[in-house]
Structure formats: C-alpha cells, structure tokens
C-alpha cells in the first residue's frame, strides 16, 4: 500500500502493475517466474507478500502464509513450540497497547530479573531492552511499543547462544547447515550493534560437544517438519549447560 515498484534495466525503469505483478516493455507485457523474497520484517517475513503471491499463483522462496505469520509473532510461536514434546522455550507474557498493563512488580514476579522486553513483531533487535531493575520495566515497554502494538516480556535465558539453519531438498531430506556460535564482544545481548556493527564473533562450527550438536540438528529438523516450513530457515538456541535442555530463543 502506497508503494511503487519498478524493474530496472540500466537507467531505464519499468513500473510494475501490482494487480498482476507484471511490467511492460515496448508494448509487450512480461510476467515473473519466481519471487526470491529477501525483505526483512514486514511485508517479507510476516505472510503479507506470501499471501499476495499466492493470489497471483507466483511461486516464491519462503514458507507459506501461515508459517510466516506464526513465526513473525514471537509470543504465538513460543506458545505453539511449547506444545511440542521435548521443546523448551522461555517463560513469557504479552502486553498490548490500549490495555491495562500489569505493574512492574507483577511482571517481575512472573518472569524475574533480568528479563527481555521486545516488540512482539519485528526483527534486527529494534526496540529490544534487557531490563535489570523494576524502574526500567515501564520505559522498556514504551520503547518496544514504538516498534509494535504488542510487546513480549520474556525470562532471560542464560547460556551460550547458537544458531542452526536448515533447508529441505527436493527429495524431502532436511539438511542442516553447520551450527554457528555467537560470542559477544562485551555487549549485554545480541542487539543491533552486535548483529550489524561487528560487536560479536560468529564462530562456525560452534564450540559445542558433538552430542549436543546432534540434538540441536535433530530439534531444528523436527521444528521444520512440525511447522511445515519451506526454503531456508534458522532457529536460535541458548545452551544452558544442562543435557537435553537446549532452549529455543
């Protein structure tokens, strides 16, 4: 809504007709064969583009509408994952703009301190705060609400942060990429600066026991199947040091 798209050919620009995602060159109309979606956040990761392309019958590179919408909603995804056997996720609660907010004391009683307060729908750690005191709770909620009308408040997970990506081959086999360990350079958590400004080291393969790596790969493949994913995905984990207690972050 409110955007114009163009196909670029050198210095020439050809406007895209959003009614059918086609464009015209020298009186001849052209259609796309495939959409490789690389847009972060909305509308690329929350099901909006996927639904649009489904209506047009245009194949694309990501999971479908339901999976993208669910995985973009942190609180809904955590609740779904919590229902799966053997999957561990951090305790959390959600607050919404316009609703009565619990008091900082009630929030801390539920999730403890430190905790993380983050936009429920968003990426790149925009609006995320690590909260250590009661006085910081409400400012962190208001900060997160600058990015989203829904805010998730989550118990802190302590441990080593790792990430595991995977994809499905045409024969149905789900293949995991090498596991990566995220080592911060002095920051409090894996925030925007750590992700994009070089304030973290990403170590591949991760410095973890092979038995742990096997469990992480198996969990990643299991979640991929249960969600019905398509294309390449990535799941982040916190290793707590307890065998079998890898928690999805």
Pin down the residues of each PLM region.
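ATP-binding N-terminal substructure of ATP-dependent carboxylate-amine bond-forming enzymes
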Residues: 1-66, 70-79, 83, 95-105
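Short Gly/Pro-enriched turn/cap motifs at secondary-structure boundaries
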Residues: 42, 119-120, 155-156, 224-228
């Amino acid at each position: 809504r409110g955007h114009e798209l163009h196909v670029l050919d050198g210095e020439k620009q050809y406007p895209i007709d959003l009614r059918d995602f086609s464009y015209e060159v020298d009186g001849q109309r052209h259609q796309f064969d495939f959409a490789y979606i690389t847009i972060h956040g909305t509308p690329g990761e929350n099901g909006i583009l996927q639904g649009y392309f489904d209506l047009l019958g245009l194949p694309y590179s990501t999971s479908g509408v339901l999976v993208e919408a669910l995985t973009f909603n942190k609180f809904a995804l955590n609740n779904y994952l919590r229902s799966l056997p053997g999957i561990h996720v951090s305790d959390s609660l959600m607050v919404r703009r316009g609703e009565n907010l619990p008091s900082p004391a009630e929030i801390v009683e539920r999730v403890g301190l430190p905790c993380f307060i983050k936009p429920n729908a968003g990426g790149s750690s925009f609006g995320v705060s690590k909260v250590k005191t009661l006085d910081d709770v409400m400012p962190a909620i208001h900060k997160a609400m600058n990015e989203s009308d829904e805010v998730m408040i989550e118990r802190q997970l302590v441990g080593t942060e790792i990430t595991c990506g995977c994809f499905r081959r045409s024969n149905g086999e789900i293949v995991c990429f090498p596991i990566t360990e995220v080592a911060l350079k002095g920051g409090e958590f894996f925030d925007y600066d750590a992700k994009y400004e070089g304030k973290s080291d990403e170590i591949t393969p991760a410095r973890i026991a092979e038995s742990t790596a096997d469990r992480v790969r198996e969990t990643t493949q299991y979640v991929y199947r249960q969600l019905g994913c398509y294309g390449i995905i990535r799941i982040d984990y916190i290793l707590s040091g307890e065998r079998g207690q890898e928690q999805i972050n």
